[in-house]
Amino acid sequence: MSQILTAPQAEALHKAMLAYLSVINAPQTAETLREELHFDESYNEATCKKFEGVLEKKWTGIARLQRRINDLEAEVRSLQAELEASPSAARAKNQDPTNWLPKPSSTHTLTSHRDAVTCVAFHPVFTSLASGSEDCTIKIWDWELGEIERTLKGHIRGVSGLDYGGQKGNTLLASCSSDLTIKLWDPSKDYANIRTLSGHDHSVSSVRFLTSNDNHLISASRDGTLRIWDVSTGFCVKVIKSATESWIRDVSPSFDGKWLVSGGRDQAITVWEVSSAEPKAALLGHENFIECCVFAPPASYEHLATLAGLKKPPPATSSCEFVATGARDKTIKLWEARGRLIKTLHGHDNWVRGLVFHPGGKYLFSVSDDKTIRCWDLSQEGRLVKTISGAHEHFVSCIRWAPSPNTDNPDPAGEKAGKKDAVKPSYRCVIATGCADNSVRVFS
């Protein structure tokens, strides 16, 4: 005690302790302590009265100070996050793309659709952006110039999903619709409709190319099935049935195309192995329809492993480790792909409609019917660090990140994600969102 308190401070503390014991009616304990401390007759009733309440005041004072310290530390963290997200901070970091967050105002607002925009997709090489709408059309834009290039007509009901993919040097655009079909469009032939894939028994909700086979794509439908198609022949090569046979709203492949994650009306997320077409895990926890699901890229493994309490992150070569999902229950959930819930992110005030990971791995972006884009920092336990309020004037239905050009690796981090001495990946800091206000917005 002598090393912490001065002699007068120690004496005052002892007197306060004796006074406290007297107040709580513990005379025997007080007398024992008085003898141990060798207090003489100078410690009388008047001294006791003088020190009554001192111990309690110091205790409550410390509690108030601790609360104030906690509040100040939280404020410092918030200000630090804002500082790091500010344009000036970005300049100070030499425009480090790993810390890029979209500005509140969009670079371009693209208007031409006559009904709600439901989906968007970026060309993997060129500055082309495709958007699909309830007006049954697909529009191709130059996102860099903010100009429309062409309108594709062919679907007879609303377009619900889009994706670019296929063989290198022969990129195709796939679209799906409530008209039960999937259509393939060839950009090298002025986006001619080269093939229509039929087989689903209800609306087709989502379509994505598989990188494990350049000729294969996966579709999800309200008929309760996932179907794998050979785009070169137009034939369905595999049908995957959900256990509940309920509406599958979304499907997303892993970066190597070996795994799928799907979710929908039954409120369950399923992880599938493509080669066996068998479910490998069921992720249960949402309380309403699943609207979107996506695998985390290896660049985010470090942060998600910390959230999951793992001693070290999984290898960057592993493609099926973590999953993010959004639902009509207004929440985003982060999962281990084996089925364990890691974190639930609260903040949206309406249905969560779309998710995309920042290729740098640090952030997760989400869009919602609450008209916002929200940015969640995975390095801060999924903390909400930025909200773009009024990103659109109506429900925000979809979000996509522009892929990196001139790369053969679909994962932006690649196998170098775990190497500290590896060269930092380069990628486009561009996102596009679609909305029920009939517009597409580009943030770059």
Curated annotation (Swiss-Prot):
Residue ranges of region Disordered? 83-107
Q: Which UniProt keywords apply?
A: Cell cycle, Cell division, Coiled coil, Cytoplasm, Cytoskeleton, Microtubule, Mitosis, Repeat, Transport, WD repeat
Record keywords: Transport included?
yes
- Give one Pfam family: LisH_PAC1
Under the heading CDD domains, the entry gives: WD40
Can you say where the WD repeats lie in this chain?
A: 112-153, 155-195, 199-239, 243-282, 285-345, 347-386, 391-437
- What does the UniProt entry list as the effect of changing residue 65 to A? Impairs self-association
Entry keyword Cell cycle: yes
Q: Which GO terms describe its molecular function?
A: dynein complex binding; microtubule binding; microtubule plus-end binding
Recorded hits in PANTHER family, A to Z, give: WD REPEAT-CONTAINING PROTEIN POP1
Domains: what does the record tell us?
Answer: Dimerization mediated by the LisH domain may be required to activate dynein.
Its annotated function is as follows: Positively regulates the activity of the minus-end directed microtubule motor protein dynein. May enhance dynein-mediated microtubule sliding by targeting dynein to the microtubule plus end. Required for nuclear migration during vegetative growth as well as development. Required for retrograde early endosome (EE) transport from the hyphal tip. Required for localization of dynein to the mitotic spindle poles. Recruits additional proteins to the dynein complex at SPBs.
Its family remark reads: Belongs to the WD repeat LIS1/nudF family.
Q: Cite the record's note on assembly.
A: Interacts with dynein. Self-associates. Interacts with bnfA, nudC and nudE.
Protein name, please? Nuclear distribution protein nudF
What organism is recorded for this protein? Emericella nidulans (strain FGSC A4 / ATCC 38163 / CBS 112.46 / NRRL 194 / M139)
